């Protein structure tokens, strides 16, 4: 009887850990798409997971999933800031970590929480995921430009460097290519939701 209870407790613990660790993991692997790793599909997987969890999953923990995914994305993607502040800003290690955490939390609050607001305002009035999700994400990206004076890190459009699509930079810019990626991952979610277990066209 004791062994059965311990197994149940261990199973519940693992399930709880997965609920918190999974969004962080999928957020952090998106960073692998950028230099020096340049594993392009990592960001596709990362954003496909995020959009599915927020707009198609029956999981009601939207705020939790969004916060943890965003923390994984920003904490890993901008962690180099700690080193820069510590070595070149004459700030203590504790101060560097504190400033990094403030930046990460600021990015999450001001550029990812609006996704939930826009979801309630727009998506609840229309089920056209393919049309509205890319619109929401590109709107958030423009907000990043405006509020942080062109904050250049972790923009999805940059992953098209060294691909056949880089010729489009001169035509539609980084934001245009970000929009292309958002449309692609939204297509993935639509196909998966319709039980079509074949990801959308090969973009790279």
Annotated model-derived regions:
Residues 1-4:
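Short, Lys/Arg-enriched N-terminal segments with co-localized hydrophobic residues
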Residues 6-204:
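Membrane-embedded alpha-helical bundles of multi-pass enzymes
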């Amino acid at each position: 009887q004791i062994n059965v209870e311990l197994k149940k407790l261990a199973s519940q613990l693992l399930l709880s850990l997965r609920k918190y660790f999974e969004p962080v993991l999928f957020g952090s692997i998106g960073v692998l798409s950028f230099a020096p790793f340049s594993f392009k599909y990592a960001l596709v997987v990362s954003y496909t997971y995020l959009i599915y969890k927020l707009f198609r999953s029956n999981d009601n923990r939207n705020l939790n999933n969004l916060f943890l995914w965003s923390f994984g994305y920003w904490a890993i993607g901008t962690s180099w800031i700690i080193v820069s502040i510590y070595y070149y800003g004459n700030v203590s290690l504790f101060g560097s970590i504190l400033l990094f955490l403030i930046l990460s939390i600021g990015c999450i609050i001001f550029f990812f929480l609006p996704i939930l607001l826009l979801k309630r305002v727009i998506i609840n009035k229309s089920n056209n995921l393919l049309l509205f999700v890319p619109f929401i994400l590109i709107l958030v990206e423009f907000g990043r430009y405006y509020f942080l004076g062109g904050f250049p890190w972790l923009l999805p459009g940059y992953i098209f460097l060294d691909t056949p699509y880089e010729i489009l930079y001169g035509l539609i810019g980084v934001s245009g290519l970000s929009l292309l990626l958002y449309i692609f991952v939204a297509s993935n979610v639509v196909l998966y939701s319709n039980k079509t277990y074949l990801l959308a066209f090969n973009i790279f």
